[in-house]
Swiss-Prot record:
NCBIfam families: S6. It comes from the Bacteria. Pfam families: Ribosomal_S6 (PF01250). The gene is rpsF. InterPro entries: Ribosomal_bS6, Ribosomal_bS6_sf, Ribosomal_S6_plastid/chlpt, Transl_elong_EF1B/ribsomal_bS6. Belongs to the bacterial ribosomal protein bS6 family. The keyword Transmembrane helix does not apply. GO terms for cellular component: cytoplasm; ribonucleoprotein complex; ribosome. This is Small ribosomal subunit protein bS6. PANTHER family: MITOCHONDRIAL 28S RIBOSOMAL PROTEIN S6 (PTHR21011), SMALL RIBOSOMAL SUBUNIT PROTEIN BS6M (PTHR21011:SF1). The keyword S-adenosyl-L-methionine does not apply. Keywords: Ribonucleoprotein, Ribosomal protein, RNA-binding, rRNA-binding.
Amino acid sequence: MTKYEILYIIRPNIDEEAKTALVERFDAILTENGAANLESKDWEKRKLAYEINDFREGIYHIATFEAETTSEALSEFDRLAKINLDILRHMIVKVEA
């Protein structure tokens, strides 16, 4: 299994309840599609380098997990993050051991 890290930026004006539901939903997408050893945590609210969708800051969230390279977890997360309006940007990287 390969170790991956996902960093995504959530819009800053989301209420706490909706943010928790969003994070739980995307964590479930990963685990239901073959990801293991998931660690998910809020990083912090930070100012963005440039404006995204009229927002100047965002809530950074980071998730680390292990998955097979052929796993659906990565592609499904990527697909759903692109169409979710609460996620401003996301990035998936493979962690070198």
